[in-house]
UniProtKB/Swiss-Prot annotation:
Organism (species): Micrococcus luteus
Family per similarity comment: Belongs to the universal ribosomal protein uL14 family.
Pfam families: Ribosomal_L14
UniProt function note: Binds to 23S rRNA. Forms part of two intersubunit bridges in the 70S ribosome.
Lineage: Bacteria, Bacillati, Actinomycetota, Actinomycetes, Micrococcales
Name of the molecule in the record: Large ribosomal subunit protein uL14
Length: 122
């Protein structure tokens, strides 16, 4: 469960290493974000010479969560860390590579570019 003030690892090559959630998008009272949900975040840690800098406000999609999420077939999926991929304004990923596995829920939410770049879809 990702909520306001949650810190996530960045799973792409934009130059950001860690982001802090400012807001969960999708309704005025929405509190939690799961896999495939979009958030607004600020960059807390970045590498020098990267595409995004520290203190930039970005949109990102959650690709991994430590909290288990239930799938329609009754199975559960959870990961070892919370991670997100930074997006452009049109919803495409800003980076050109994705690191680590991503959840199958991204395919259902039409993030096909992220699914195709990911090394593994679980």
């Amino acid at each position: 469960m990702i909520q306001q003030e949650s810190r996530l690892k960045v799973a792409d090559n934009t130059g950001a290493k860690e982001i802090l959630t400012i807001r969960v998008l999708g309704g005025s009272g929405r509190r939690y974000a799961g896999i495939g949900d979009t958030i607004v975040a600020t960059v807390k840690d970045a590498i020098p010479g990267g595409n995004v800098k520290k203190a930039h406000v970005v949109k990102a999609v959650v690709v991994r969560t430590r909290k288990q999420s239930r799938r329609p077939d009754g199975s559960y999926i959870k990961f070892d860390e919370n991670a997100a991929v930074i997006l452009k304004t049109d919803g495409e990923p800003r980076g050109t590579r994705i690191f680590g596995p991503v959840g199958r829920e991204l395919r259902d939410k039409k993030f096909m570019k992220i699914v195709s770049l990911a090394p593994e879809v679980i």
